[in-house]
Amino acid sequence: MSLSPDLPPSEEQNLEIQGSATNCYSVVIIEEQDDTFNDQPFYCEMCQQHFIDQCETHGPPSFTCDSPAALGTPQRALLTLPQGLVIGRSSISHAGLGVFNQGQTVPLGMHFGPFDGEEISEEKALDSANSWVICRGNNQYSYIDAEKDTHSNWMKFVVCSRSETEQNLVAFQQNGRILFRCCRPISPGQEFRVWYAEEYAQGLGAIWDKIWDNKCISQGSTEEQATQNCPCPFCHYSFPTLVYLHAHVKRTHPNEYAQFTQTHPLESEAHTPITEVEQCLVASDEALSTQTQPVTESPQEQISTQNGQPIHQTENSDEPDASDIYTAAGEISDEIHACVDCGRSFLRSCHLKRHQRTIHSKEKPYCCSQCKKCFSQATGLKRHQHTHQEQEKNIESPDRPSDIYPCTKCTLSFVAKINLHQHLKRHHHGEYLRLVESGSLTAETEEDHTEVCFDKQDPNYEPPSRGRKSTKNSLKGRGCPKKVAVGRPRGRPPKNKNLEVEVQKISPICTNCEQSFSDLETLKTHQCPRRDDEGDNVEHPQEASQYICGECIRAFSNLDLLKAHECIQQGEGSYCCPHCDLYFNRMCNLRRHERTIHSKEKPYCCTVCLKSFTQSSGLKRHQQSHLRRKSHRQSSALFTAAIFPCAYCPFSFTDERYLYKHIRRHHPEMSLKYLSFQEGGVLSVEKPHSCSQCCKSFSTIKGFKNHSCFKQGEKVYLCPDCGKAFSWFNSLKQHQRIHTGEKPYTCSQCGKSFVHSGQLNVHLRTHTGEKPFLCSQCGESFRQSGDLRRHEQKHSGVRPCQCPDCGKSFSRPQSLKAHQQLHVGTKLFPCTQCGKSFTRRYHLTRHHQKMHS
């Protein structure tokens, strides 16, 4: 697996590594070395030669030093991360965290280390996935384990390589320590992948085989992937990929390796992560879903099949449909070019090469000669070079107007008018229809790149005829609620050249607010404020909401909506509820009322987590959360994980929200500066709903209504057991669990149950050891934010809870409450045997131990 050639017999070396405090790249200083270690010499990647002191051509080896952090420091593994490196979610599926390069390109021959850890026994090393073996000679070994964060460094997060093409680090032993050597240049954004040197493993034997197998098995094998594991036919080990299995058989079962390669050829194994194959399938489904959108027929390529019939395929399409490969007769083509990594098939070999280059290898062979920016496809390079040409024209003639087309509805600009039209059609459809109506779009643009609207009630309306015919005479105004698309679905070739253009029905869209509807009737009942020419809302008194419900004071724009309202007067509806005598004008409203109020029935069930809902809208909102999680997992597994490093300390995060919370908690003086820097980004989302009492803003009206100040004093949900009132129904349900003893949230590891889900989340941190709340002054970590706040009060000396009687201050309200009992004289803890009462619980416990035990 290693790129290094076989080494000559190891020689005695007198080397010690010392890092420089000012420069990340240091050299090796010669000192006396312990000759009891069975070390390997250094290796020069440039001249492919081994050396002991220094290379005759390139000098001594270079090292990247760790950031200084004393042993025993909490989270030392993160604090030792060198400058330019960050830790984030690994691009290998289910591999956990990984190390990424965010600085300059790491050159060949750069060394990292040594690997820090705690020396453990052989039995513990065989059960750990973070152990390395140190060979001391004469079959004597020591084991370094990085399980504890207080004794390890950042090298514990480097994941194992799945193939030789992925490997960019080589692990070897030098001076009784494990070092990593860069065997391939590591560009910015790439992840560190390590594999051991062959000469290092030769003298370790079966013990190293078991330890390394534990590393490979722990990386990527979960219960969900148990069916995809590759078991070894000669022992009980199982591996997540065939590459790991081949390395294991070659190392542990060398006599059976020749027979094994015949039955399990490595060439057919796709070392692509499983989620990457799923991503390809999702891309195929998305390509199929785009068939309902209009696309152009020119420019096209005519691909002749064996039958001599033409197959049309759009030239600019990045990936044709993998699941639908058609000939002119509707049959599947005989010549299929299949991808060995994900199984997708293509009509032409060039499309297969482009797919492998853009999806799997991430190769970008097309580079700009001016700015050195690279692209995976030639079309992207052409579009990019067009920007340079426009810049040169503007420099040569400053008075010449720039060919930049800004969008009037947002801040984006485009170098081509057709790109602006496509942007308007997708994101500002109302403005796009206005341009079509005013004639700003040319006939060529309408024909090739747009959707056009027809009104079948218009006497001048003519359906699309055979061939390619301009449709500009058939355009209708903005008020047209129905649209038909001129074009053919993507990837579906016509049966012959004279085939009629397909007519695709699109959902009606309101031209004022750009909201889409399922049918025309819903669009007609929809009412929204009209806009003037500048885009501002113009209220018309005659169109205001004039129909008001007498019970709930809710206003409606027309009488039909008011009649369909649930709060209509008794006797006005045709459908009566048998439980509460409420009348409804529609049967569906009555059924929904019975289901949500009386029967508590939840017929809408999620197929993923089996959670049930009373209404279909709740199920749809819930399913969106699963889709977001799935797309996030697929994108994080297929592409390099997004890393958000903190600019004020060495911590890094995989989500920008976590980074902002970290800055707000540990760098409060920088939080406002960070927010101003993020203007227009994710964190500066518009929040139009503001609370006048606490000045807190919300992005949605639902979040504003659920705010505590909104319902302050309004407690409408009473507990039937103790009479306590609540403002929210969910709060009442959680409170009733105290009376019923129900604990629905159970820990899967120890079986302990909890009333609230938040209690379970905090409890799970006791199993994982996670302490995400870090004190910025002493470095101590805590599982809960409340523990951190109480701890920070020790540093600040602030005691916010003050007794109004004597003025004594306390850091916790519980301590103040117990102190106030001394002034009142209340003794809440009586003894059940003698009747004596006490003000403190520990006083009662001490009384039991002395008097009654």
Swiss-Prot record:
Give the compositionally biased regions (Polar residues).
Answer: 291-314
Which residues are recorded as binding Zn(2+) 6?
831, 834, 847
Catalytic activity, EC: 2.1.1.-, 2.1.1.359, 2.1.1.354, 2.1.1.355
User: Binding of Zn(2+) 3: at which residues?
Assistant: 747, 750, 763, 767
- Residues in C2H2-type zinc fingers run 230-253, 337-360, 366-388, 405-428, 508-528, 547-569, 575-598, 604-626, 644-666, 689-711, 717-739, 745-767, 773-795, 801-823, 829-852
Query: What subcellular locations does the record give?
Result: Nucleus; Chromosome
Which reaction(s) does the protein catalyse, per the Swiss-Prot or TrEMBL entry?
Answer: L-lysyl-[protein] + S-adenosyl-L-methionine = N(6)-methyl-L-lysyl-[protein] + S-adenosyl-L-homocysteine + H(+); N(6)-methyl-L-lysyl-[protein] + S-adenosyl-L-methionine = N(6),N(6)-dimethyl-L-lysyl-[protein] + S-adenosyl-L-homocysteine + H(+); L-lysyl(4)-[histone H3] + 3 S-adenosyl-L-methionine = N(6),N(6),N(6)-trimethyl-L-lysyl(4)-[histone H3] + 3 S-adenosyl-L-homocysteine + 3 H(+); L-lysyl(36)-[histone H3] + 3 S-adenosyl-L-methionine = N(6),N(6),N(6)-trimethyl-L-lysyl(36)-[histone H3] + 3 S-adenosyl-L-homocysteine + 3 H(+)
Superkingdom of origin organism? Eukaryota
Q: Name one Pfam family in it.
A: PRDM2_PR
Residues reported in the UniProt entry to bind Zn(2+) 2: 407, 410, 423, 428
Chain segments carrying region DNA-binding? 755-845
Q: Which GO terms describe its biological process?
A: double-strand break repair involved in meiotic recombination; female gamete generation; homologous chromosome pairing at meiosis; male gamete generation; methylation; negative regulation of apoptotic process; positive regulation of fertilization; regulation of gene expression
Instruction: Tell me which SUPFAM superfamilies the record gives.
Output: beta-beta-alpha zinc fingers (SSF57667)
Q: Recite the UniProt keywords alphabetically.
A: Activator, Chromatin regulator, Chromosome, DNA-binding, Meiosis, Metal-binding, Methyltransferase, Nucleus, Repeat, S-adenosyl-L-methionine, Transcription, Transcription regulation, Transferase, Zinc, Zinc-finger
One GO cellular component assignment for this chain's record is: chromosome
Assembly and binders: Homodimer.
Domain-related comment: The C2H2-type zinc fingers determines the hotspot localization through its binding to specific DNA sequences. Variations in their sequence affects affinity towards DNA-binding motif.
What name appears for this protein in its UniProt entry? Answer: Histone-lysine N-methyltransferase PRDM9
Organism of provenance: Danio rerio
